[in-house]
């Protein structure tokens, strides 16, 4: 395990990489490095907006595929994003190859994952913390129905 750093954000990978080329999107403020996909996700922000940068070809600690396979998989996924374009689906700003990596830059979307398995132990240790799933369960019926309407609106696009 090697500690990598971009701005004040530290993350663990199997190898040391220089991610300073991401500085064109601003400053790093968030990272997910424990993925089985062989991708690392880095949140970047400049004075005007935030970006979600997904980078394939990185040898993550939890990778279930090789770096080269992760590049192929992400490139295939990008085609699906374009095919499924919808107002409620995160939008791709750009995608490109960079050295051995494949990079997809998305608009940032604030929110939480309803099934954030990486935090299960955190919620068990701190019973005062509510998981996103618990927060969703506590929403009013009208807000839950609105969420379902958004989901169904998206699913109408899927063939």
Q: What is each model feature region?
A:
Residues 137-148:
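Short alpha-helical scaffold element within the canonical Hanks-type protein kinase domain
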Residues 37-79:
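ATP-binding glycine-rich loop module of kinase domains
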Residues 153-159:
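Protein kinase catalytic-loop region centered on the HRD/HxD motif
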Residues 1-30:
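Juxta-kinase regulatory segment immediately upstream of eukaryotic protein kinase catalytic domains
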Residues 95:
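Activation-segment/catalytic-loop signature of the eukaryotic protein kinase fold
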Residues 77-87:
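Structural motif at the C-terminus of the N-lobe alphaC helix and the adjacent alphaC-beta4 loop
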Residues 99-113:
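Conserved short submotifs of the Hanks-type protein kinase catalytic core
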Residues 109-131:
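Structural motif in protein kinase domains
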């Amino acid at each position: 395990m090697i500690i990598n750093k971009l701005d004040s954000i530290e993350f663990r990978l199997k190898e040391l990489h220089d991610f300073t080329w991401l500085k064109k999107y601003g400053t790093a403020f968030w990272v997910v490095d424990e993925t089985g996909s062989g991708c690392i996700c880095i949140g970047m922000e400049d004075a005007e907006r935030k970006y979600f940068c997904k980078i394939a070809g990185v040898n993550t600690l939890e990778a279930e595929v090789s770096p080269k396979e992760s590049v192929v998989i992400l490139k295939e996924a990008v085609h699906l994003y374009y095919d499924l374009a919808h107002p409620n689906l995160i939008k791709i700003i750009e995608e490109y190859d960079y050295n051995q990596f494949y990079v997809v830059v998305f608009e940032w979307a604030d929110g939480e994952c309803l099934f954030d398995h990486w935090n299960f132990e955190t919620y068990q240790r701190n019973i005062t913390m509510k998981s996103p799933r618990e927060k969703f369960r506590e929403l009013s019926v009208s807000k839950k129905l609105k969420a379902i309407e958004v989901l169904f609106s998206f699913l109408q696009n899927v063939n």
